Structure formats: C-alpha cells, structure tokens
Regions:
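Long, compositionally biased
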Residues: 299-330, 334, 384-407
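Hydrophobic alpha-helix feature that most strongly marks membrane-spanning transmembrane helices
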Residues: 278, 313-317, 321-329, 359, ...
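Small/polar glycine-rich anion-binding or flexible loop at a beta-alpha turn
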Residues: 291, 333-341, 371-375
Length: 407
C-alpha cells in the first residue's frame, strides 16, 4: 500500500447508525427531527422505556412443565430453559437480552432475534436491530424476514428461524412504532427543552430592577453592577438581602405569563409521554396531578402491572411458545413470568381476600395455592362451609315457619 493511499481512501464521517437515524427521522410541526437517539434524550421518554424494559428484564422468567391437570413444575433439563434463564448468547445475560429486546419493542414496535439451532434445540438467540429487518407475509401466510448484514448483504430467513416480538399491530405482520406515533409529543418536548436552554444561555432571566432617584454616571453604574455581582451573584449568594442606599429601591420582576406557560408546557409533555407508554406519572416524577388508578402509590403500582406490564408479559410468553418451542411441546410446556414480586406490597389485601374466599367456600386451599404458583397438598381440595351455615350442609330444608320477633 502506497504512502499516499491514506489520502485517497474514503473515510466515514458519520456512522451507519447516524445515517439511518437521519433518514428515518421525522420532521415534526415543532421543527424538531425525532429519531431513536433524540427521543432517548427526553427525560420522560427515557424513564418510561427504562421502567418497562427494566421490569421485563428483571422479572423471573421460567419454563413450566404441566405434570397433570393440577401440578406444575419448572421444566428442569429442558434445553431452552438454559437459554432463557442462564445465557441467551455468548455476550448477554438473560436480563440484558430481555431489556434490550423490550426497548426495541417499545420504540420500534418490533423486536427480532435469530435462532441458532443444533438439531431441534435452540442453543443461542442473536438479537437483530429492527431497522435491519424487513418482515413480510407470503401468500401461504407464513412469515419471512429479510435481514441486512453489516456488510450490506441481505439474507432471507424463514419464520422458524426468527423470534419475533410484535407490539400492537393493524396488519398482523409488524407492530406499530410508538416512536412514529408520538413524534409530535417528543418533538415539542425537545423544542421546549432547547428553548429553555437558550433562555438560560442568553441570560434573559432577570431577578429584579434597582431604581435610583437620581442619574448615575457610567462609572457609578459600573461600580454598582460590580458590587451587586460580587455580593449577590451565584448560587452561593442566593437569598442574600440587597442593601439599598442613596434612596435606591429594589423592584422584583415576577415570572411572566409566557415563562409560566413554558413551564406548564414542560409539565404537560411529561404526562403526555407517560400516557403513550402507559406509565403512571408518579413513576417518572410527575406528581402534580392525581390519578384515577387509586389514591395510594401501592394502588398505582398494581394498576401499572395490571394494565401495562401484563400486556407486554403476554406478548413475551406467547411469542416464546410460538417461535421457540416445538409444536409437539405446546401442550406440555409454558413460558411464565412471575409478577408476584411486584405485587408483594399488597400482600395484606391479597391474603385477606383469600381468607374470605376460604371461609365462604369460594376457593379450596389448593385453589389458593395455585393462585400463588404453589403445588397442591393432600387434603387441600376441601371447600369449607360458610360461617352462618356450618353444620347445615346436607340437611333437608325445614318446613317449619321461620321464627318471628315481637316488640
């Protein structure tokens, strides 16, 4: 290679990901270009994605084998179990893999992983960036996936070779991108943040005005400015009193209606973004308004699990069964997340309900144990008599008139 070849060799000034973001970025009414990277710079969006993907990544996930109609147990020894619970691929832990896949699912509406097979067994799951995958449905209704490699070549994979997590979809083929649907909200949040930064950079926030009854010479005005800056400027001097001399008066400048509206817009954007992701506002630091999910943090947390996380959990469980388990095992093996850890804060209310259900014969002990993912015990299929009918079960109804009371 000649010495001058370094000058002739083209150099990449931007990365491929940056070019992809530029092409995919959407112009908004606010003027902001919303891309995956710019969306993650919005604090509310970052927190929502982090909360949901973090929950999916940390919740216990296991394969459960159905022993019989009642008994369930971990599918110990099943090859896929190690992939899901120990090591999905050579460089990721299970929580890292699920967290990344869920983040892609939230932003792009789809998450993909290539299955590495040895015989009939999945031995690794290789995550694929959604922007490199084109999902198509054939005339036979089977899916196929065209994946663009880092060298620019495209490889086509059959449905049986890909794990596909699909968000809410209108065509049943690909999930809808949250990033595309909330680009106006994200654009407004980005522009509001930028406007605030420029406001502080240009120093347009005035604390007040000092009025002098006379006329100050340029030198006197300069000395007054320097004196005020030395004594009152900076965070360490915040709150210090100003000593007005020679008849001077201090008039504070109140927050203008425009500034107040700017602050209100920032608050509104947090609620709007939280609504897109289904995250309770208090979980992203927006506590100014109440919620209809309950008056307490505990009730709001349960609502988050019930109305948001359960949707994604079901997507994971059913996609694992469809794409990773052989059809011959569909009746015997299930993928299950354990959300009990997120609901432990309501243990008092949950067990109080169980006690009432047991007392009134609604549940048997084994049915309660099943709700808690516990195996049945001997003698646990008994239904207890309600308290006010104890000893009456099995007796013929009496024809005697009911007793009456007299005043």
């Amino acid at each position: 290679m000649g010495i001058f070849s370094r000058f002739r060799r083209p150099r990449a000034l931007v990365s491929e990901d940056q070019i992809r973001d530029f092409i995919r970025g959407s112009n908004t009414t606010s003027g902001a270009i919303v891309t995956e990277s710019s969306a993650m710079r919005v604090a509310a969006a970052w927190r929502c994605i982090n909360i949901i993907s973090g929950a999916i990544g940390t919740l216990p996930l296991d394969l459960i084998r159905r022993v019989d109609e009642k008994v369930r147990e971990p599918a110990v020894g099943y090859p896929l179990r190690r992939i899901l619970t120990v090591k999905p691929n050579p460089w990721q832990t299970p929580s890292e893999f699920r967290r990344m896949m869920q983040a892609n699912l939230l932003l792009r509406g789809n998450a993909y992983a290539r299955k590495v097979m040895v015989g009939r067994n999945v031995v690794a799951l290789i995550p694929l960036h959604p922007d490199r995958v084109q999902a198509e449905q054939l005339d036979s209704f089977a899916m196929q996936y065209k994946v663009r490699g880092s060298n620019g070549t495209t490889t086509t994979f059959a449905q049986k070779e890909i794990l596909h997590l699909r968000g809410m979809s209108l065509d049943g083929v690909t999930g809808m991108s949250v990033l595309s649907n909330m680009r106006e909200s994200l654009g407004l949040a980005l522009q509001t943040e930028k406007a605030g930064a420029r406001l502080f950079k240009n120093g347009m926030l005035t604390g007040g005005v000092i009025e002098h009854p006379g006329k100050l010479s340029p030198e006197a005005a300069k000395n007054l400015h320097e004196s005020l800056d030395a004594r009152n400027a900076g965070a360490d001097n915040a709150g210090k009193w100003i000593l007005a001399e020679e008849g001077m008066t201090f008039r504070p400048v109140a927050l203008s209606a425009e500034d107040a509206q700017w602050l209100g817009t920032r608050d509104y954007q947090r609620y709007d973004i939280a609504m897109f992701f289904g995250v309770p506002p208090h979980m992203i630091g927006a506590t100014e308004k109440t919620t209809s999910w309950g008056s307490g943090i505990e009730a709001q947390g349960i609502g988050f699990v019930t109305y948001t996380l359960n949707d994604w959990i079901k997507t994971w469980e059913e996609s694992i069964k469809r794409d990773l388990l052989p059809e011959s095992d569909w009746e015997a093996i299930d993928a299950r997340f354990n959300v009990n850890g997120l609901l432990r804060g309501d243990v008092k209310g949950r067990w109080g309900g169980y006690v009432q259900a047991l007392q009134w014969g609604v549940y048997s002990p084994n049915e309660v144990r099943a709700l808690e993912d516990q195996n049945p015990r001997d003698g646990g299929d008994v239904y207890y008599d309600p308290p006010n009918t104890a000893g009456q079960i099995g007796k013929e109804p009496s024809n005697e008139p009911a007793p009456t009371t007299t005043n």
